């Protein structure tokens, strides 16, 4: 009986670990060299997007892009700004030598579909937003806010 209980706990812990890994935003650093995922002071994931090209397009590639109930902030601000879901956040260091993006493309290169179960916010300059995942996008309770400073 003791051995069976230990095995059951071990299996449970393994699946718990797998489920928790799927709730993340993971950059594909082989493609997006400067894309950074951090956290706001309250723990909400904070994405410092790539600098835009000459057309104002910030192309960001992820192995995984999932937004849980806490939400996520896409930082499109050069300066300190107040976000709705994370409070005050620092300017995006990737934008210090460029302008803010007019379009943000979030592309998923991994094999899993994206799960969007929370609020996504573009903090800083207003921008068009595209989420592309060839494996699919599951949306439940999602919202998108585009704030302009």
Model-derived regions, located:
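Bacterial N-terminal signal peptides
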Residues: 10-20
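Bacterial N-terminal signal peptides that target proteins for export
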Residues: 1-9
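Solvent-exposed adhesion/ligand-recognition segments of exported proteins
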Residues: 21-149
């Amino acid at each position: 009986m003791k051995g069976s209980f230990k095995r059951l706990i071990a299996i449970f812990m393994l699946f718990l670990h797998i489920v928790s890994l799927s709730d993340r935003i993971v950059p594909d650093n082989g493609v997006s060299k400067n894309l950074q995922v951090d956290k706001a002071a309250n723990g909400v994931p904070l994405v410092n997007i790539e600098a835009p090209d000459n057309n104002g397009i910030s192309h960001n590639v992820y192995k995984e892009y999932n937004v849980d109930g806490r939400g996520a902030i896409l930082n499109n601000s050069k300066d300190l700004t107040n976000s709705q879901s994370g409070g005050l956040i620092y300017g995006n260091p990737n934008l210090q030598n460029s302008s803010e993006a007019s379009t943000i493309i979030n592309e998923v290169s991994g094999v899993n579909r994206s799960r969007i179960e929370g609020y996504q916010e573009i903090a800083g300059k207003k921008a068009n937003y595209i989420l592309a995942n060839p494996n699919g996008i599951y949306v439940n309770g999602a919202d998108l806010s585009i704030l302009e400073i």
